[in-house]
Amino acid sequence: SESYTPISGPNGYXVDVK
C-alpha cells in the first residue's frame, strides 16, 4: 500500500510505497 509519511520529501512529505 501507499504510506504517506510527514517527513522530508518533494513537497514537505515523503511518499513511502510499500
Swiss-Prot record:
Protein purpose: Lectin that binds galactose, galactose-containing sugars and gentiobiose. It is strongly mitogenic for human T-lymphocytes.
Protein name (record): Lectin
Annotated GO MF terms: carbohydrate binding
Keyword DNA repair (UniProt): no
Superkingdom per UniProt: Eukaryota
PTM summary: N-glycosylated.
Species lineage: Eukaryota, Viridiplantae, Streptophyta, Embryophyta, Tracheophyta
Assembly behavior: Homodimer.
Disulfide partners: none
Protein keywords: Lectin
